Design a protein with these regions (language model features):
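Membrane-interface anchoring determinants
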Residues: 1-85
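A residue-level detector for the "anchor" residue at the start of short, highly conserved motifs
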Residues: 32, 44-48, 60-344
């Protein structure tokens, strides 16, 4: 942070603050702090963009080149980009191949190789080199499981991208995430595990937690099931230490961070094909259905004030899910050329 510029702002304002009421002072300082945080975000984004552009000009591939540490700006830039809305196959990208799986997949890493299992068969692939960096992309409409070489297990929701080392060894374990995942991190006190999004860093030793970080969403959140988690980030004023049954939320629209006690099942039951809502706006509900089923919706303006409370089973298909919503909310829906039109 450029402390000189902030000191200048403070020195300009202090002589006049004596003329302000206490409430006005509080609002003014809050606005200054918010602007300062936004400036940090702008600087970080500028550094990332310049680093990525420099790599392209130099003829260097953004993705599979350089050391893990030196490539961090490129990885952050990569995961900050929204996933394409179109569906497709689940993809595992390595330094020398692209593996596509049409149905929900489980990818497991071992010493020197990794396996890819779908509903039909299991295939074995060699890991070319210990430092190889892989990427797994789960398109909208599909989910997948990823078991890392250190023993950490991940369930990946629709529209999720993960960048990780094929062989996790050394004193630190890191992954880069765009989308949503539930993690059961293998406990290792000598090697912290860190999940990096484009805004936050989540550090643990061994725990179970959910991370939601879709680039198209204003908010990013972490829900802790067990263990301990530390959340940091360039946009945060300080580190947040989480306890089980807490949810941390960062709102990028106003740079606000919050920590609250929640029912963790509301945020993790998607791993079982269930969604639970407590007064959720129907547009937020439809957004989650859009990602899960890779479906398109057109909403009439008359539904914007509808809220949904209850449990929704996703395993019976999109029409069954919409029928359940219709029963509790009174909405009408119809499918016209793969576009669901929603109205009262």
């Amino acid at each position: 942070m450029n402390t000189n510029s902030e000191d200048e702002i403070f020195s300009i304002l202090k002589p006049v603050e004596t003329c302000l009421a206490e409430d006005d002072k509080a609002r003014l300082w809050a606005r200054i702090r918010q602007d300062s945080l936004r400036m940090r975000a702008f600087r970080r984004a500028a550094v990332i963009a310049v680093s990525a552009a420099a790599a392209i000009v130099a003829g260097v591939a953004i993705y599979f080149t350089g050391t893990w540490r030196s490539a961090e700006p490129q990885y952050i830039q990569y995961i900050s980009e929204a996933m394409p809305e179109a569906g497709g196959d689940i993809r595992i990208e390595t330094s020398d191949k692209v593996i596509e799986v049409s149905s929900d997949a489980t990818v497991s890493y071992h010493d020197g190789y990794f396996s890819v299992r779908d509903s039909v068969e299991t295939k074995i692939h060699d890991i070319k080199k210990g430092g190889d960096v892989h990427q797994m992309i789960v398109p909208f409409g599909k989910t997948a499981c990823l078991n890392l070489s250190d023993g950490t297990k991940m369930q990946l929701n629709s529209g999720t991208r993960v960048i990780y080392k094929a062989e996790m060894n050394g004193r630190s374990r890191e992954i880069y995430l765009n989308g949503e995942a539930f993690l059961d991190v293998f406990h290792d006190e000598t090697s912290p595990f860190c999940v990096k999004t484009d805004r936050l860093d989540v550090s643990v030793l061994g725990t179970k937690f959910n991370v939601k970080a879709y680039p198209s969403d204003k908010q990013q959140s972490i829900v802790l099931v067990s263990g301990k988690v530390s959340v940091t980030g360039n946009l945060l004023e300080h580190a947040y230490q989480m306890k089980p049954e807490q949810r941390f939320c960062y709102d990028g629209s106003n740079c606000n961070a919050s920590l609250e006690t929640v029912d963790v099942e509301d945020y993790t039951c998607w791993t079982e094909g269930i969604l639970r809502f407590n007064g959720a706006n129907i547009k937020d509900v439809l957004m989650q259905l859009s990602r899960y089923y890779n479906a398109r919706f057109s909403c009439d303006s008359t539904i914007t004030d509808i809220s949904i409370t209850g449990k929704l089973d996703l395993r019976n298909g999109i029409d069954a899910a919409l029928e359940s919503i219709s029963l509790v909310s009174g909405i009408k829906y119809r499918n016209r050329h793969s576009l669901y039109e929603i109205s009262k």
